[in-house]
Amino acid sequence: MPEYRSKTSTHGRNMAGARALWRATGVMETDFGKPIIAVANSFTQFVPGHVHLHNMGQLVAREIEKAGAIAKEFNTIAIDDGIAMGHSGMLYSLPSRDLIADSIEYMVNAHCADALVCISNCDKITPGMLIAAMRLNIPTIFVSGGPMEAGKVIGVANIQPERRLDLIDAMIESADDNVSNRQVEEVEQNACPTCGSCSGMFTANSMNCLTEALGLSLPGNGSYLATHAGRKELFLEAGRMIVEITKRYYEQDDETVLPRSIATKKAFENAMTMDIAMGGSTNTILHLLAVANEAGVDFKMADIDRLSRVVPCICKTAPNNHDYYMEDVHRAGGIFAILKELDKAGKLHTDVYTIHAPTLKDAIEKWDVTNPENTRAIERFKAAPGGVRTTQAFSQNRIWKTLDLDREKGCIRDVAHAYSQDGGLAVLFGNIAERGCVVKTAGVDESILKFTGRARVFESQEAAVEGILGNQIVAGNIVIIRYEGPKGGPGMQEMLYPTSYLKSKGLGKACALLTDGRFSGGTSGLSIGHASPEAAEGGAIGLVHEGDTIEIDIPKRSIRLVISDEELAARRAEMEARGSKAWKPENRDRYVSAALRAYGAMATSADKGAVRDVSQIER
């Protein structure tokens, strides 16, 4: 029987000083001996996905205390990728994932907490907390802030029909010379109407959905709107459940509630299967690889490639399809509706554990909104957007009269009526990316699934943006942005502005983009990222010359620099001959802080999840 970790600092004569300090935090004499639950919040006023989390930690804490445990809240950092986008701030986004994981490890281990509640929401916060959960392997539950409502705009002087929109529309239209200043202003004012993570299937929402598929959060966690009053119950239930599973582990020796018992190889395959089926962000691949690495699970790019070939796309939302947003996914039954359709097609391992049901199979049955007997599930997934601008959580209680149960033409479809039999994400291999690169196929037009073009080479995102806005890119070009990987950036910037500007210039279906950097979950089009190994690690993307021909064949999962092996070897030898200047960008003027240099010194390429490898600096 495992012993409560907290006894280290709460029991024994020699811990009198520690107990004195615990008392100063509000712990009473009768509390000693109760489990101590750490509540890792990520509230910040910088990020709309986190601005409403101010009181969430205490909401969970009070429920924990009612259930018979001690709750202690602390905070982590949270970076808004959208605000950090397009300037040097984006260098800090991915490295913050590791800082978040480290900070949680430090706080939980320093204070000997017995269990953990992770209150996350946006892009790097959820994966950072997942990494911490795997590292600590104590009872853990995730509850996120929820997605924002989709924006709406009527159009200038009510001439245009009403349309829904999001952050990406503001970025694209701001660079489109055919869109007036007034139209841009209207889009800007309406794109992000409420608190919550951005309204499409971008990175934040993708990751929060994946915590459901992994079995570490409650049903609805990824799709229940931040503004809806019903979401409050997720936080309250998380507070009660963490105490329950904590006692099951420490008092009943039930290891099935531990993160590493839940997030097994089968669970990672389930999560990736669901991700492919819903056309999630390519960043999810990066993060799942990193989380699996921390969990000690042998889950690699080859596994993702294998799954991508057999899983169809059965849910297609913004940015890949502007008919549907997260609020529509929720109305259709949420993530468990997607999981049900995948299970019917034999695509899942349903014998895995979850924190809220004995097995995934049990959970799918319990949360099936097509079963009229599941009244709790039906009530939860009728939650609708309020349509009122607000930064307040739980501020409206509007409900849909009916659910979207149309599995032929609705938001979530059965496998027979899939949006495409090819999944929403794919891994490509070839001489330019020997360890793979990633594309969100759900966002690629069918006309360019096979594409051959001439390389336009840029040594930084800034140079590429300047080239695109300066009309240097024409139809048939493949924009190469290199030395933007985890090590080369350092920090692996998102390339949302280059892809958005290509659309602004009318080149969204006429060009491709290849980078060793990554993309926002809001990216669509023939945008291929995570080229591994990256240029700074000796990857062949660093050997591409201006005007080279590159062939892309998504159905065959291939990408090829059209030169001979001998020519490629000669270019590599020429690069190596540059000595200390080899595998470094030319003429790039970029300030890199000591913190970023430290990250870059340990960072691995994207095919390994961009995790830190301390052995690279050990002597």
Curated annotation (Swiss-Prot):
Catalyzed reaction equations: (2R)-2,3-dihydroxy-3-methylbutanoate = 3-methyl-2-oxobutanoate + H2O; (2R,3R)-2,3-dihydroxy-3-methylpentanoate = (S)-3-methyl-2-oxopentanoate + H2O
Binding site for Mg(2+): D81, D123, K124, E494
Domain of life where this protein originates: Bacteria
Enzyme class: lyase
Cofactor(s) annotated in UniProt: [2Fe-2S] cluster; Mg(2+)
Pfam families, per database record: ILV_EDD_C, ILVD_EDD_N
Entry keyword annotation includes Magnesium: yes
EC number: 4.2.1.9
An example Gene Ontology CC term for this record: cytosol
Record PTM N6-carboxylysine, positions in chain: K124
Active site: S520
Matches recorded under SUPFAM superfamilies: IlvD/EDD N-terminal domain-like, LeuD/IlvD-like
Binding site for [2Fe-2S] cluster: C122, C198
UniProt cofactor note: Binds 1 [2Fe-2S] cluster per subunit. This cluster acts as a Lewis acid cofactor.
Gene Ontology MF: a single term: magnesium ion binding
Keywords assigned by UniProt, alphabetized: 2Fe-2S, Amino-acid biosynthesis, Branched-chain amino acid biosynthesis, Iron, Iron-sulfur, Lyase, Magnesium, Metal-binding
Assigned protein family: Belongs to the IlvD/Edd family.
Protein name according to UniProt: Dihydroxy-acid dehydratase
Source species: Neisseria gonorrhoeae (strain ATCC 700825 / FA 1090)
Gene for this chain: ilvD
